[in-house]
Amino acid sequence: MSGKTKRLMVMAGGTGGHVFPGLAVAHHLMAQGWQVRWLGTADRMEASLVPQHGIEIDFIKISGLRGKGLMAQLTAPIRIYRAVRQAQKIMRDYQPNVVLGMGGYVSGPGGLAAWLCGVPVVLHEQNGIAGLTNRWLARIAKKVLQAFPGAFPNADVVGNPVRTDVLALPLPAVRLSGREGPIRVLVIGGSQGARILNQTLPLVAASLGEQITLWHQVGKGALPEVSQAYQQAGQAGHLVVEFIDDMAAAYAWADVVVCRSGALTVSEVAAAGLPAIFVPFQHKDRQQYWNALPLEKAGAAKIIEQPQFTATSVSSLLASWDRATLLSMAERARSVAIPDATERVAAEVVAASKSA
């Protein structure tokens, strides 16, 4: 297909941690003249989000098996076979030069279909420990990439593509220069909130008083309850919101962030150059722990496992950090970021298209 417009099929779905990095790479390649389509599922966030970015999307029918009953397990081979056949038809119609797998259930059937159609697969693992689908697809992928070291033994570490407005933030030494007053604590619960953060931070605010000021994003439906908790703690002066539309502005405001350690969050915190207290979601694979570990090892963050995340432990930690310490941690966070992750992933897609 030399001389013709190059075509990319992005496979990603389910969560923002899969979809947003895929969109970053898609836009980068579209700016270079590539044509991009998306493979997803009709009942997850990509169905509405991807078309908003001017990218056409095709759907296959597939869902996860974890936590499903015996009947779902028994019928899984049939459903996977049907999903692969659906994806094969889409691949034959679109004829992509390369398929980029960014994670989610759709990547399994989609990646196998691409391989059966002779289309090279570039795989990107966002988390510090590889998911089951990507571990399986790595055997047939043309190139395997990872955001954090350790997910695959021999894969290139390229980081996670993050939003350009976060990458454009001033370096910590510039952003934090001359700051005085209470330490600014940004609390990010995610779109669904994090109950442990919502329960604990009002008590931390009461413990530390005027030493800190908080901007607390509580998640969908949690605003009345958490606002009341701050009021009952005598801490009604903090900013408590359901969502934050401009995360770059929030990062720019903050001196330190308290949050879960999803792959994209960790990558954004590093790119912004922010110290962090990470509270990994308790999952049997411990993905979020492994995501946060490189920043803790770099001296840029502390990990507090959920059972140990108490008002006492958090208050003690925050009280031990002065502005000089926070600046040092911020600079270490920025030093381990990979700000050109989008370009690195895109370059591997281009390379795979040339060797196809």
Curated annotation (Swiss-Prot):
Keywords: Cell cycle, Cell division, Cell inner membrane, Cell membrane, Cell shape, Cell wall biogenesis/degradation, Glycosyltransferase, Membrane, Peptidoglycan synthesis, Transferase
Residues engaged in binding UDP-N-acetyl-alpha-D-glucosamine: T15, G16, G17, N127, R163, S191, I244, A263, L264, T265, V266, S267, E268, Q288
Pathway(s) per entry: Cell wall biogenesis; peptidoglycan biosynthesis
CDD domains (alphabetical): GT28_MurG
Catalytic activity reported: di-trans,octa-cis-undecaprenyl diphospho-N-acetyl-alpha-D-muramoyl-L-alanyl-D-glutamyl-meso-2,6-diaminopimeloyl-D-alanyl-D-alanine + UDP-N-acetyl-alpha-D-glucosamine = di-trans,octa-cis-undecaprenyl diphospho-[N-acetyl-alpha-D-glucosaminyl-(1->4)]-N-acetyl-alpha-D-muramoyl-L-alanyl-D-glutamyl-meso-2,6-diaminopimeloyl-D-alanyl-D-alanine + UDP + H(+)
GO CC terms: plasma membrane
GO-annotated biological processes: carbohydrate metabolic process; cell division; cell wall organization; lipid glycosylation; peptidoglycan biosynthetic process; regulation of cell shape
Enzyme nomenclature, EC number: 2.4.1.227
Family according to the record: Belongs to the glycosyltransferase 28 family. MurG subfamily.
Protein name per Swiss-Prot or TrEMBL: UDP-N-acetylglucosamine--N-acetylmuramyl-(pentapeptide) pyrophosphoryl-undecaprenol N-acetylglucosamine transferase
Organism encoding this protein: Yersinia pestis
Chain's gene name: murG
